[in-house]
Design a protein with these regions (language model features):
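Carrier-protein-dependent adenylate-forming modules in NRPS/ANL systems
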Residues: 1-163, 173-174
Length: 174
């Protein structure tokens, strides 16, 4: 459990970035995630909102995802190579008004015009929130599949379901 590890093993390495080898401890990851949650709230994200995350794999993607969850919102992964038409359909079906991305990607990706862009780099200037607002019945994430019609169809996963899956995986691979 991330929160438990952040409290009991704060100096242990939580992530090793496969791209550049940078390491981040549980304490650092928690602090960055709490700052991201504050940035999201300051940008207008409310509990139970869906927020897309469009980032390359790495520390920023994990910080963004955790920040979304801590803010009590759900995340919707939208790949950096997603065609605009498919992305627009996902945004529309999910009633999504916010995207977390980086300044390096914003010029390379076309986002729907009515979506507010929140940059991961802006957590450098933020405070952090006190505690997670996530609840077991809140949406943790939505995965859009191609569906039988070829149109994106969202599958909602609640925090309780995601937690059960993680507990099961952890028990199998101890």
């Amino acid at each position: 459990d991330f929160s438990k590890n952040a409290e009991t093993k704060p100096d242990n390495i939580a992530i090793v970035d496969g791209e550049n080898g940078n390491k981040i401890t549980y304490a650092e990851l928690k602090e960055k995630a709490m700052e991201m949650a504050f940035l999201l709230e300051s940008s207008g994200v409310k509990e139970r909102d869906l927020v897309t995350i469009t980032l390359n794999r790495g520390v920023s993607q994990i910080v963004g995802t955790l920040g979304i969850l801590i803010a009590g919102a759900g995340y919707v992964p939208v790949g950096t190579n997603q065609p605009l038409k498919r992305a627009e359909t996902i945004y529309k079906r999910g009633n999504i008004k916010y995207v977390v991305t980086s300044r390096t990607l914003v010029d390379k990706i076309e986002f729907p015009k009515d979506v507010k862009i929140i940059y991961t780099e802006d957590i450098q200037i933020c405070k952090s929130i006190d505690k997670s607002k996530a609840k077991s019945d809140y949406t943790a994430y939505v995965i859009f599949t191609s569906g039988s019609t070829g149109e994106p169809k969202g599958v909602v996963i609640k925090h309780a379901n995601a937690c059960n899956t993680i507990v099961d995986i952890n028990s199998r691979y101890k």
